Amino acid sequence: MQIDRLPVLSDNYIFLVLDPERRQAAVVDPAVAAPVLERLRSLQFQLVAIFNTHHHHDHVGGNQELLQHFPTAVVYGGAEDRGRIPGQQVFLQPGDRVNFAQRTAEVLFVPGHTRAHIAYYFPPVNHSSGELFCGDTLFAGGCGRLFEGTPAQMVNSLNQLRQLPDNTRVWCAHEYTLKNLQFALTIEPENVELQTRLAQVYLARQHFQPTVPSELGLEKRTNPFLRWDVPQVQQSVKGQDGIQTFTRLRGRKDQF
């Protein structure tokens, strides 16, 4: 399984998951169709699946046009997004499995950003890393805004993701890393690894290099939204427990 990253719009990423043996592809959260179609033409691959994490237009906007070119492609999304994802044919429940490229993804229910948000987790096989397509739930250095969910839901969702192996690659759907880490440093100014990461990301972005995928272990050590139970983070926002700490973090980030 190979993964191509397609930058689109101002800061979105579309991910094209490739099966070279079968010359087939699946696309994750196609905001628009044109770059996907162009890449598929250059590879001469057939699109067989569209994996949507949630219903926002910058994640599903390309569905219908892709289906016009590949009418047999199957559109997957969360069961609770019924009626909100264009062309959806498969309505996934938590714990469902999805097969592609001789790998099997587990469907994780991760509400918070939206009420129906799901993630696709491909566990490691042999010596490969796990692959997490988490949409707008977890970002490199941050997390998604809460549009339809509650802080308690988001903490539970992020805690699910936090349980995955440290070497899991995190394929989040936006290039928000620099601003996220600038905020994170206001919460943990003494976190040396965070300081180093911010410097590296700043340099990467100066050269227009992507910062996605990230690695989950790095997120656990430097992303405040996975560190709501770390004493230094709680003290920074005067949080009494995990949910209050997360709520105050999210409120500060919304104003940052």
UniProtKB/Swiss-Prot annotation:
| Pathway recorded for this protein | Secondary metabolite metabolism; methylglyoxal degradation; (R)-lactate from methylglyoxal: step 2/2
Task: Name the positions where Zn(2+) 1 binds.
Answer: 54, 56, 113, 136
Record bears the keyword Metal-binding: yes
An example Gene Ontology biological process: methylglyoxal catabolic process to D-lactate via S-lactoyl-glutathione
Coiled coil located at which positions?
Answer: none
InterPro entries for this protein: Clx_II_MBL, Glyoxalase_II_hydrolase, HAGH_C, Hydroxyacylglutathione_Hdrlase, Metallo-B-lactamas, RibonucZ/Hydroxyglut_hydro
Sites where the protein binds Zn(2+) 2? 58-59, 136, 174
Under the heading CDD domains, the entry gives: hydroxyacylglutathione_hydrolase_MBL-fold
Q: Which GO terms describe its molecular function?
A: hydroxyacylglutathione hydrolase activity; metal ion binding
Q: What is its EC number?
A: 3.1.2.6
Instruction: Spell out the reaction equation it catalyses.
Output: an S-(2-hydroxyacyl)glutathione + H2O = a 2-hydroxy carboxylate + glutathione + H(+)
Q: What is its cofactor?
A: Zn(2+)
- Co-factor: note: Binds 2 Zn(2+) ions per subunit.
Cite the Pfam families for this sequence. Answer: HAGH_C, Lactamase_B
Please explain the role this protein plays, according to its UniProt record: Thiolesterase that catalyzes the hydrolysis of S-D-lactoyl-glutathione to form glutathione and D-lactic acid.
**Which NCBIfam families does the record associate with it?**
GSH_gloB (TIGR03413)
Q: Tell me which family the UniProt entry assigns to this protein.
A: Belongs to the metallo-beta-lactamase superfamily. Glyoxalase II family.
Subunit composition? Monomer.
Q: What is this protein called?
A: Hydroxyacylglutathione hydrolase
Its lineage opens with:
Bacteria, Bacillati, Cyanobacteriota, Cyanophyceae, Gomontiellales
